[in-house]
Amino acid sequence: MAPGPWPVSCLRGGPLGLTYLSLLLIPAAAGTYCECSLGLSREALIALLVVLAGISASCFCALVIVAIGVLRAKGETCPRQVDNRLVENFGVQEDLMDLHPVYVESQLMDADLEVSLVPPLEDQSLVAIPMEASSEEPPPPPPLPPE
């Protein structure tokens, strides 16, 4: 047995109500008389339906995109096959390689390495200008203006 018709108050806000309203507006779009008295003109109701249809379509597209993303994420639990040509041409893919850190320790010291690698400024014909030490204290900051 089919359920009875819904009360009119249930049809106002939901998608079924919007579908019902659009069915009422089909004769209005054809140029015939419309019995819907919502306080809006026929053109305003048609514009409202167009806007609501656009919003519904964009929400549906967003839902489809999210669903595809979730399905792809669930499908990538096993490692993928990687084309070796892509790895060679575009660099190393670290998530698929087993990298281990390498520590090198040496007890030998080279005499040349103990010398600083940066030459002194005097060798570059640059002169460092020393700051003059001033015994004067800086002047106090000006007082704040009254509020």
UniProtKB/Swiss-Prot annotation:
The chain crosses the membrane at residues 48-68. Keywords: Cytoplasmic vesicle, Membrane, Signal, Transmembrane, Transmembrane helix. Pfam families: TMEM210. It is found in: Membrane; Cytoplasmic vesicle, Secretory vesicle, Acrosome. It comes from the Eukaryota. Residues 69-147 are cytoplasmic. InterPro entries: TMEM210 (IPR028123). One of its GO terms (cellular component) is membrane. Residues 137-147 have a biased composition (Pro residues). It is a single-pass type I membrane protein. Residues 128-147 are annotated as: Disordered. Residues 32-47 are extracellular. This is Transmembrane protein 210. Residues 1-31 form the signal peptide.
